[in-house]
């Protein structure tokens, strides 16, 4: 059966470790894996604009010996004049894998149903699993482990980053806290899934409206923009609602003294995070951004290897 990566929990805890171990290896020896030599082509499709996702996937695919085919919104008929399943059947005849940054998660699921090559979710409205892999790689670099650590997310608990922090964090054995106001809490489906995983890994889940409760003793502090793509018309309302959830010096005072700060970027200083935090010594956001490259290379290498094993 073809392996895909649409959600963080598409990797078991042991598989997540395999990918993160490989990511560390590829960071040390950038060109040691060449699974796309030929070169084979990987389509990288964007329905949403991107900087880090395009940079990291295009560079990573080239590092792996492949050819990145960048398809921007409006440059193809994906999802327009034929079913995604039909498009997928054509794509699998020419490509080694498909990477898609899109809106509705259901589109990814439909694409998967029609293809026998790996599909990677480069971001959907539901989750952002490639980012969380990079986050976990960064945590391992700075803390030496993930299991038993507390990771606290502040802000829009219904966002894709909050959902992926939940799923990816508990898969890694972390205690995950989400601090969010009423009306912006995580989708109950993701909370239930995360709790089920945590019961097996020793992690835990806490959803709270109290940012102080989430910050207390935390090892990893995470936030994201308050105004995601597609939410621009809610900007004023969101800034007012999330004001108490800004990450600032007070947040760090409550956290563990050795806590690190993560943000997937772009960041808006003075809104979700203060300049004191993101530009300070506890911020690891630039390492985190670089690790998108290494984590995604490891993921693609792992998926291609698994699918070749299954084909034998």
From Swiss-Prot:
EC top class, as a word: transferase
Binding site for L-ornithine: 160, 224, 228-229
GO biological process, one term: citrulline biosynthetic process
EC numbers: 2.1.3.3
Record keywords: Amino-acid biosynthesis, Arginine biosynthesis, Cytoplasm, Transferase
Coiled-coil residue spans: none
Catalytic activity: carbamoyl phosphate + L-ornithine = L-citrulline + phosphate + H(+)
Gene Ontology cellular component list: cytoplasm
Highest taxon of source: Bacteria
Recorded metabolic or biological pathway in which this protein acts: Amino-acid biosynthesis; L-arginine biosynthesis; L-arginine from L-ornithine and carbamoyl phosphate: step 1/3
GO molecular function (one): amino acid binding
Record carries keyword Isomerase: no
A matching Pfam family: OTCace_N
Residues that hold carbamoyl phosphate according to the record: 50-53, 77, 101, 128-131, 264-265, 292
Cited SUPFAM superfamilies: Aspartate/ornithine carbamoyltransferase
Leader peptide range in chain numbering: none
Primary localization: cytoplasm
Cellular localization per UniProt: Cytoplasm
Similarity field: Belongs to the aspartate/ornithine carbamoyltransferase superfamily. OTCase family.
HAMAP family named among the record's database cross-references: OTCase
Known role: Reversibly catalyzes the transfer of the carbamoyl group from carbamoyl phosphate (CP) to the N(epsilon) atom of ornithine (ORN) to produce L-citrulline.
Name by which UniProt lists this protein: Ornithine carbamoyltransferase
Source species: Leifsonia xyli subsp. xyli (strain CTCB07)
Lineage, opening ranks: Bacteria, Bacillati, Actinomycetota, Actinomycetes, Micrococcales
This protein's encoding gene: argF
């Amino acid at each position: 059966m073809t392996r895909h990566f649409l959600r963080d929990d598409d990797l078991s805890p042991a598989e997540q470790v395999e990918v993160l171990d490989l990511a560390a290896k590829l960071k040390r020896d950038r060109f040691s894996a060449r699974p796309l030599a030929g070169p084979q082509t990987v389509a990288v499709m964007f329905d949403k604009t991107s900087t880090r996702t395009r940079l990291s996937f295009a560079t990573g695919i080239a590092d792996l010996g492949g050819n990145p085919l960048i398809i921007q919104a409006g440059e193809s008929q994906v999802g327009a004049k034929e079913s995604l399943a039909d498009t997928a059947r054509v794509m699998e005849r020419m490509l080694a894998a498909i990477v898609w940054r899109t809106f509705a998660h259901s589109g990814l699921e439909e694409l998967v149903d029609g293809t026998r090559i790996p599909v990677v979710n480069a971001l959907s409205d539901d989750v952002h699993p490639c980012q969380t892999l990079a986050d976990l790689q960064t945590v391992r670099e700075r803390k030496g482990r993930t299991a038993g650590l507390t990771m606290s997310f502040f802000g829009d608990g219904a966002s894709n980053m909050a959902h992926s922090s939940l799923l990816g964090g508990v898969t890694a054995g972390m205690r995950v806290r989400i601090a969010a106001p009423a009306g912006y809490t995580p989708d109950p489906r993701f909370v239930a899934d995360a709790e089920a995983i945590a019961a097996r890994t020793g992690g835990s889940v806490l959803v709270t409206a109290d940012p102080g409760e989430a910050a207390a003793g935390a090892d990893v502090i995470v936030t994201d923009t308050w105004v995601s793509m597609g939410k621009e018309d809610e900007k004023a309302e969101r800034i007012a609602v999330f004001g108490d959830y800004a990450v600032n010096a007070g947040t760090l005072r409550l956290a563990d003294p050795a806590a690190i700060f993560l943000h997937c970027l772009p960041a808006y200083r003075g809104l979700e995070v203060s300049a004191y935090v993101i530009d300070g010594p506890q911020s690891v956001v630039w390492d985190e951004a670089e690790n998108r490259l290494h984590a995604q290379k490891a993921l693609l290498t792992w998926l291609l290897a698994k699918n070749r094993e299954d084909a034998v």
